[in-house]
Amino acid sequence: MKNNPLISIYMPTWNRQQLAIRAIKSVLRQDYSNWEMIIVDDCSTSWEQLQQYVTALNDPRITYIHNDINSGACAVRNQAIMLAQGEYITGIDDDDEWTPNRLSVFLAHKQQLVTHAFLYANDYVCQGEVYSQPASLPLYPKSPYSRRLFYKRNIIGNQVFTWAWRFKECLFDTELKAAQDYDIFLRMVVEYGEPWKVEEATQILHINHGEMQITSSPKKFSGYFHFYRKHKDKFDRASKKYQLFTLYQIRNKRMTWRTLLTLLSVRNGKRLADGIRGR
């Protein structure tokens, strides 16, 4: 393996110029410099400022593509992934940021990819507050990988780090309207083995930023239902109960007593109690 491998970074974006620029700035601050960033704009109606910003950077590592037709987040992710030239690859959402050491932290654990599907790390969460250092933000610690947990819910998050050829082999499912990350991570785990968790927090998840959210509730339900039908043969009885309970929560549909008794488990019972308490 090369000591200074090229890392490809893919970023889909749509009508969030200021947030996308913030994400790009966090990539530019990386303490590891051998990367390329492929930004695919999914036919935004407002995009000139973002294009001008990238052009003014005059950084050959950054490529900006504005599509003439809106094709959806998964399609533009795949478009960027197939253009990637790096040995390794990872993604960034246009409303998130990286800590300066994200790429170097992942590279320090790259040997784990020989026996693991991908790497993932903890995150920080920002709910709009002003901060000077990421470490001052609340930590979003992720669970160490376990099949029992992962087959019930996405414990990985929204981004992973792995060999580029693995993403090119799997790609995102353009038919899914929700759970797209969960879907590709699950397929990678089935194909390449368990993932490896890195303990450092290297990403800042921004929530409640006031801009348009990409997934609406009806799409989320139909997409998650599609995801469940696609993978239900992989799930054991406990995982199926958990997944079906999730579908009822997404749809916000009242369960009959018969359905409730059918899906009842210790974990679902706790979720039900938390819901009643408004947590």
From Swiss-Prot:
- Keywords linked to the UniProt accession: Lipopolysaccharide biosynthesis, Transferase
Which Cys pairs does UniProt list as disulfide-bonded? none
Q: Does the keyword Transferase apply?
A: yes
Q: Which GO terms describe its biological process?
A: colanic acid biosynthetic process; lipopolysaccharide biosynthetic process; slime layer polysaccharide biosynthetic process
Identify the stretch annotated as signal peptide in this record: none
- Mark the transmembrane ranges: none
Give this protein's Gene Ontology molecular function annotations.
glucuronosyltransferase activity; glycosyltransferase activity
InterPro entries membership = Colanic_acid_synth_WcaA (IPR024009), Glyco_trans_2-like (IPR001173), Nucleotide-diphossugar_trans (IPR029044)
Which domain of life, per UniProt? Bacteria
One Pfam family hit: Glycos_transf_2
| Pathway it works in | Slime biogenesis; slime polysaccharide biosynthesis
Keyword Acyltransferase appears in the UniProt entry? no
The UniProt family comment states: To R.meliloti ExoO.
Know the name of this protein? Putative colanic acid biosynthesis glycosyl transferase WcaA
Name the encoding gene, please.
Answer: wcaA
